[in-house]
Amino acid sequence: MRVLGIDPGLRNMGWGVIDVSGTRLAHVANGICHSDSGDLAQRLLSLHRQLTDILARFAPDTAAVEHTFVNKDGVATLKLGQARGIALLVPAQAGLAVGEYAPNAVKKTVVGVGHAAKEQIQHMVRLHLPGVELAGADAADALAVAICHAHHVQSSGRLEAALARAAR
């Protein structure tokens, strides 16, 4: 299974692709979609095009997006929400199921604690994906989202199998 993880952002949208085979994870690619300052509609269109190209290039089977948080700056929160809309829309347009995870859930899955620092996330992503060269903190966060989704899908599959066995 190939998983695309996305860390939404208007200026920098991190993305990471991993392959999952059983309990084994393998890094495929990671990077950051950038949008220049200027007209909001053009920035969102740029993110949409870049993310669409990534889906076409790496052909993931599923995707996952990190939830955004609400802060005191309402305008910034709304803009971030619009970028998150692009992160949800592009995989959905490609027919992919999209998982959504809270930042603390991602950190808990990857690091073991829900309030981990960026450096801890990057360190654990490197441990999960040996040899990975991170394009930046946003790409590391996106890979962490992909790892979280892979674990969630595996856990769900084991639960469904156990329930099916119990029903027999």
From Swiss-Prot:
Keyword presence, Magnesium: yes
Active site: D7, E66, D138
GO cellular component, one term: Holliday junction resolvase complex
Xref: InterPro entries: RNaseH-like_sf, RNaseH_sf, X-over_junc_endoDNase_Mg_BS, X-over_junc_endoDNase_RuvC
UniProt name for this protein: Crossover junction endodeoxyribonuclease RuvC
Subunit structure: Homodimer which binds Holliday junction (HJ) DNA. The HJ becomes 2-fold symmetrical on binding to RuvC with unstacked arms; it has a different conformation from HJ DNA in complex with RuvA. In the full resolvosome a probable DNA-RuvA(4)-RuvB(12)-RuvC(2) complex forms which resolves the HJ.
Top-level EC class as recorded in UniProt: hydrolase
PANTHER family assigned: CROSSOVER JUNCTION ENDODEOXYRIBONUCLEASE RUVC
Cofactor: Mg(2+)
Protein's UniProt keywords contain RNA-binding: no
Chief localisation class: cytoplasm
Subcellular location: Cytoplasm
Superkingdom: Bacteria
Pfam families, per database record: RuvC
E.C. no: 3.1.21.10
CDD domains membership: RuvC (cd16962)
Keywords: Cytoplasm, DNA damage, DNA recombination, DNA repair, DNA-binding, Endonuclease, Hydrolase, Magnesium, Metal-binding, Nuclease
GO MF annotations, alphabetized: crossover junction DNA endonuclease activity; DNA binding; magnesium ion binding
Sequence positions that bind Mg(2+) 1: D7, D138
Family assignment from sequence similarity: Belongs to the RuvC family.
